[in-house]
Amino acid sequence: MKPLLLRTLFLAIGIGSLCFHSTTASAQAPQKPDKHYALSDTIALTIFDYAQYRAYYQKEYRDVPSDPKSYQWLQLLQIGSKYQGYVNYGELRADSIWNASIKAGKSRNGFHNEWSAAKDESRPDVYLLFDRNKGVLDAYDKIFINKYHYTEPIPQQQWTMAEGDSTILGYTCHKATTRFRGRDYIAWYTEEIPYPYGPYKFGGLPGLITCIYDTQR
């Protein structure tokens, strides 16, 4: 794996919000083990690209906008030269703990608590892999015990620049709005980080999206 110098930041999506910082990584597609895996098995990984930048987003979700109870967990955006990945960070961390522990010859009892804690940090969420050369994304999801995969063209949002600036972690951010798949969103982006990407399926602004939320949040 190539060592890469990455920067640190925190951001905000969805029905709710997202957050980020960074280190080194490669954009990977984790293949989840079946429920009845053997303890000696490691998780198969395919390296698609090497991350040039990565951002951790803290997602906040409510079942309905009026619900006072919200769920929060980390998601990770990895940006490479050809691909980008958007994953549930808790599940990715749990997979890393599993792999490292199995390779080190540990018994399940030796790492179960750490692995379980990482899993508990997150909620089931979709995994996205963007192939920018082909202009498509692959989505992997799981509902209960059923696993789903679909491919679609990378969505292109139509953005409207709006008045108003903000500062997020020292970065000057600008406001933009869009309507995407039946919902209206407000986004903040910074031209100081020159990547036209963001959380989930959002992108296309002249800089990294640092915060996005649905207007009904």
Model-derived regions: residue spans:
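Extended soluble regions of mature proteins
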Residues: 29-217
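Bacterial Sec-dependent N-terminal signal peptides
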Residues: 1-33, 37
